Amino acid sequence: MKTHYRVVVIGGGIVGTSILYHLTRKGWTDIALIERAELTAGSTWHAAAGFHALNADPNVSALQTYTINLYREIEKESGQSVGMHMPGGYSIATSPQRWEWLQAESAIYETLGIGARLVTPEEIVAECPIVAPEGLLGGLYDPHEGAVDPHG
C-alpha cells in the first residue's frame, strides 16, 4: 500500500463512494478510500433511500435530478442493478392551505421542467386505494419519485 495519495476519502458510505466515483470519472488515479468495515455498512445501509426531483430551489432540484439520472447511468455502465424502483409519488392536501401551497409549488415545478402535475382526489384514490378519500382536496404527482436498495 502506498503511503501518500493526492486524496484520501474517509468512509465508504454514499458520500464517500460518490466522491471517489466522481474523482475517477475526472481521471484522478492517485486516490484512496478508507472504510473500517464493508462499503455502505454504516448509516447508508440503514437509509430509506428514497428520492424525488421536487424542490422549489432550482439548484437542489437539479442536484436531485442529477442523482436520479446517475443511478440509471451506473446501472447501465456496470450491468448491476441498484434496486431502483421509480413508481412516482403523491403529495396530498387535506386542508385548503396545503392545497393552495401545492398549487403554487406546481407552478414552480412547471417552470423548472420537472413534470409534476396536480391531480384530483379521484385520481389519487384510484392509484392508491389505501388513501381515504374523505377530506382529500387533491394532490401533486411527481413521476420522478422512487427509491433504490441501499444494501443491495
Write out the residue ranges for each language-model feature.
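Beta1/beta-strand and adjacent pyrophosphate-binding region of the FAD-binding site
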Residues: M1-V15, A32
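Glycine-rich FAD pyrophosphate-binding loop
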Residues: T24-W45
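Dinucleotide-binding Rossmann-like beta1-alpha1 core, especially the glycine-rich loop
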Residues: A49-E127
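FAD-binding beta-loop-beta segment adjacent to the flavin cofactor pocket
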Residues: T40, A126-P133
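Helical element adjacent to the flavin cofactor pocket in flavoenzyme catalytic cores
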Residues: Y141-G152
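Hydrophobic alpha-helical packing residues
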Residues: L23-T24, Y109
